[in-house]
C-alpha cells in the first residue's frame, strides 16, 4: 500500500479558482511510479493536478469496505499491538501495527475494530484509534 498527496485546482461556487489537497491511500499500487500514475488518473478531471507526495504506507490493511456512495463515512486509523510467544526463547513479544477502517463516528469505529481484534489468532489489544486525514482509498 502507498499513500499519496495530490493538489489540484477547482472552481468554487463563486467562480473563483481554489487549490485543494487530498490525501489518499492506494491499496494495489505496485511501485512508486504506479502510485504516481494512479494519482494523476484520479485527478484527470481537474486542472493543475500534481502528485506532491508518495510514500509507502505504514498501514497493514483496510479492515472493512466503505458503504457504497456513503460520503458521510470517515477513515479512522487504529494502532493495534499483537502479543505472541517466541517459540525459541519462550518470551512474550509485541508487534505494533496500524490498520484503517471506515466508520461514521468514533463509536462505530471502536465497535468495528473490536470485532477485527476478536478475529485475531493471537492476543491483540487496541492501543489507539483516531480519525485520519485521508480523503479516500483508491483500489
For the regions a protein language model found, what residue spans apply to each?
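Short N-terminal segments
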Residues: 1-4, 12-13, 50, 64
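A short beta-strand micro-motif
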Residues: 1-9, 76-83
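A cross-kingdom feature marking solvent-exposed beta-strand/loop segments within repeated
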Residues: 10-26, 46, 91-99, 119-121, ...
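Short, flexible N-terminal segments of the mature chain
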Residues: 17-34, 38, 99-108
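Short, well-structured hydrophobic secondary-structure segments
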Residues: 28-58
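Short, solvent-exposed interaction modules
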Residues: 46, 57-121
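Glycine-rich, aromatic-bearing surface loops/beta-hairpins
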Residues: 120-139
Amino acid at each position: 500500500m502507498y499513500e499519496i498527496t495530490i493538489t489540484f485546482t477547482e472552481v468554487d461556487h463563486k467562480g473563483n479558482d481554489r487549490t485543494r489537497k487530498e490525501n489518499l491511500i492506494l491499496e494495489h499500487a505496485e511501485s512508486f511510479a504506479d502510485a504516481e500514475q494512479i494519482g494523476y488518473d484520479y485527478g484527470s478531471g481537474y486542472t493543475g493536478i500534481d502528485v506532491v507526495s508518495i510514500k509507502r504506507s505504514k498501514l497493514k490493511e483496510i479492515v472493512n469496505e466503505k458503504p457504497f456512495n456513503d460520503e458521510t463515512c470517515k477513515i479512522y486509523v487504529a494502532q493495534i499491538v499483537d502479543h505472541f510467544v517466541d517459540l525459541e526463547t519462550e518470551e512474550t513479544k509485541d508487534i505494533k501495527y496500524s490498520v484503517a477502517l471506515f466508520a461514521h463516528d468514533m463509536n462505530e469505529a471502536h465497535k468495528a475494530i473490536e470485532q477485527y481484534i476478536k478475529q485475531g489468532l493471537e492476543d491483540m489489544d487496541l492501543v489507539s484509534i483516531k480519525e485520519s486525514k485521508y480523503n479516500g482509498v483508491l483500489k
